[in-house]
Amino acid sequence: GSENTLDHDEGGFIGQNQAFALKGINKDVSIEWNIPDITPQNMIDYQYSKNDVQFEIKDLIQIIEKTIDREHEDERHNLTKGRLQKDLINWFIDDQFKLFYKKQDLSKTFDATFTLLIDASASMHDKMDETIKGVVLFHETLKSLNIKHEILAFNEDAFEADQRQQPNIIDEIINYNYSIFEKEGPRIMTLEPQDDNRDGVAIRIASERLLQRSHEQRFLIVFSDGEPSAFNYSQDGILDTYEAVERARKFGIEVFNVFLSQEPITEDIEQTIHNIYGQFALFVEGVEHLPSHLSPCLLY
């Protein structure tokens, strides 16, 4: 079971930013929001999954902390106590120690937010277990660092979609406002493969929500196996998804794709994903390799 959340948080306000409006090939898409219920079994499974990635969590925490440290160094370069105040009149008024001021210490807070977007289509059936571990790894890492984030899963209802309307379902797995609380994590275990995937729509929705956040850096990480597939979408889906990614980047959102699998990844799939995401596409065979693959994206 799940509860409909059209008015939950910003769930009901999609399409206010014209840059991300659903039009053209997506003009007849309807959006339904859900919050999946957490079962006792989800809670048990979550503990197992968390234990599976405990070492990777430590690695990813270190990588993000390095990113924070580098920002510190850039900001404090050549200054003994912090950034030089613009108003040099203070030199004459106060003693010289007050000439410098420190920006708020960011060692425990990182002025960034993340949205994880998970393709919950049928083609993910053999990749979902590994993807869930990757999402748990991210959630636990960001929670440890006190970084607010949102996790959404998306699919299109293949049985209800027709010329008139294409219902797309967004599952709110982790709510931004509650993302650093303990009790939310087990909802990640509700992720399961459903029907089709209209990636361009999901990316526009996630981007619009990200732009409502006041953080300096915004990351959108799409966990997907590549090719979009939905009603009347197959031919133009790749182009539509590419356009959604490019639009998000124009607004300063850092977008990249993560393909997590235990199986070798074919060249055809790699090429499709590169066509959409450019160089910011990660192909990872096994969640244990995810931190090392992410490092260049976060530290570039």
Spell out what each predicted region is.
Residues 140-148, 211-216, 247-251:
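Secondary-structure transition/capping motifs at alpha-helix termini
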Residues 1-112:
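Acidic/polar low-complexity segments with low predicted structural confidence
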Residues 116, 122, 133-140, 149, ...:
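Feature representing long, continuous alpha-helical segments
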Residues 207, 226-275:
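VWA/integrin I-like adhesion module and closely mimicked acidic/polar interface patches used
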Residues 106-217, 219-222, 257-264:
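Von Willebrand factor
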Residues 121-129, 188-198, 209-211, 227-239, ...:
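Short, contiguous acidic/charged loop-to-helix segments that flank catalytic cores in large enzymes
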Residues 274-300:
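C-terminal helix of von Willebrand factor
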